[in-house]
């Protein structure tokens, strides 16, 4: 199995490729910002378009497209692909997408207009006139979405792999519908505020080891609705956390029998919410055992990752290997004192083979 970590701005986009014993398979998790596919201002194509063009030329498809949640830094690259490529749907065989309408139907609640995702496609390629439609209507019309809710506790087999869903819970979906209208945009709930990179790792660890330190969890209802999961291929396990909240993930891991004495062992953990300090806590790091921690962001927008998060990881696992997809983040977040105090392994990783 090969996992490619696409440069997705301050967002997420991962391409997983493997052979199921019969044919090559591809799973795409999120699409990053719109520039991940194509930047109209710079007239340059991003990693997502490069990878999709390669698959298309090779006669391969996206067997499963997972949209973890509807934040711009996860969905806009996908929307740009469907907007600019009128044959994009032909490459996609199946989609996981908890749309606002689907969640409302599942919960038998009124739909929230603010949760709709719009899509503009060329209705006439000669005139360049765009037609505005709902993204979910497009997916239904092209018959690539079965409208199945993806929710905590499900165990799904796709293309020779097993996926254990950790979030969202039904409670988190209810919160999304009931609270989102008052928090449209969610900027106050997701922003990383100023960078904390000036502070030493050692200082963070000493501060958090004090008995009176309290963890403050992310309050974004959109992030809480993220599809997070354990992916298993043969004897390899991978943890993809989207922008999920740690408490809900921990609760589900415990329900599956994992704890600090019987941790979930994975080959890779995609750190939640681009390394935000509000999405990874000590308890989660005790329940999940791995060497490889991947953080996807260029640090624009919300100033992620928080160095405090990396300090928590180092405190829990001094042998941690950090994987970044932007060199300036890898180079700037650790200072000389950090490297003197700890043996830090930080890499720029475009892909990993397992």
Show which residues each predicted segment covers.
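Active-site catalytic pocket residues across diverse enzymes, especially alpha/beta-hydrolases
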Residues: 18-20, 56, 82-86, 253-257, ...
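Long, well-ordered mid-to-C-terminal structural blocks that present hydrophobic/aromatic surfaces
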Residues: 225, 229-279
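C-terminal functional module detector
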Residues: 167, 173, 200, 211-215, ...
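Flexible, acidic/histidine-containing loops and adjacent segments that form or flank the divalent-metal
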Residues: 85-237, 320, 325-326, 336-354
């Amino acid at each position: 199995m090969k996992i490619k970590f696409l440069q997705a701005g301050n967002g997420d986009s991962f391409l997983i490729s493997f052979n199921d014993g019969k044919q090559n398979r591809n799973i795409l998790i999120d699409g990053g910002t719109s520039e991940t596919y194509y930047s109209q201002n710079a007239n340059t194509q991003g990693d997502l378009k490069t990878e999709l063009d390669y698959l298309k030329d090779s006669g391969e498809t996206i067997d499963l497209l997972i949209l973890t949640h509807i934040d711009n830094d996860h969905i806009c690259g996908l929307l740009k692909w469907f907007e600019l490529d009128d044959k994009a749907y032909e490459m996609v065989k199946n989609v996981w997408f908890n749309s606002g309408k689907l969640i409302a139907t599942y919960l038998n609640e009124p739909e929230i207009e603010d949760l709709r995702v719009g899509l503009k496609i060329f209705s006439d390629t000669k005139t360049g006139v765009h037609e505005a439609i709902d993204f979910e209507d497009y997916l239904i019309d092209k018959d690539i979405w079965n409208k199945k809710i993806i929710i905590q506790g499900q165990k799904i087999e796709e293309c020779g792999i097993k996926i254990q869903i950790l979030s969202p819970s039904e409670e988190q979906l209810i919160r999304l519908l009931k609270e989102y209208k008052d928090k449209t945009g969610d900027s106050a709930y997701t922003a990383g505020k100023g960078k904390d990179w000036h502070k030493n790792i050692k200082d963070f660890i000493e501060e958090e080891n004090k008995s009176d330190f309290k963890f403050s969890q992310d309050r974004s209802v959109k992030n809480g609705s993220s599809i997070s999961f354990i992916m298993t291929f043969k004897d390899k396990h991978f943890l993809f956390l989207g922008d999920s909240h740690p408490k809900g993930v921990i609760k589900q891991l415990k329900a599956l029998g994992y704890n600090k004495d019987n941790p979930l062992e994975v080959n890779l953990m995609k750190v939640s919410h681009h390394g935000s300090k509000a999405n990874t806590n000590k308890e989660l790091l005790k329940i999940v055992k791995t060497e490889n921690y991947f953080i996807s962001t260029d640090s624009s927008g919300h100033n992620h990752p928080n160095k405090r998060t990396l300090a928590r990881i180092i405190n829990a696992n001094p042998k941690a290997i950090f994987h970044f997809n932007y060199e300036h983040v890898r180079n700037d977040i650790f200072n000389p004192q950090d490297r003197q105090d700890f043996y830090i392994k930080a890499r720029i990783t475009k892909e990993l083979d397992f």
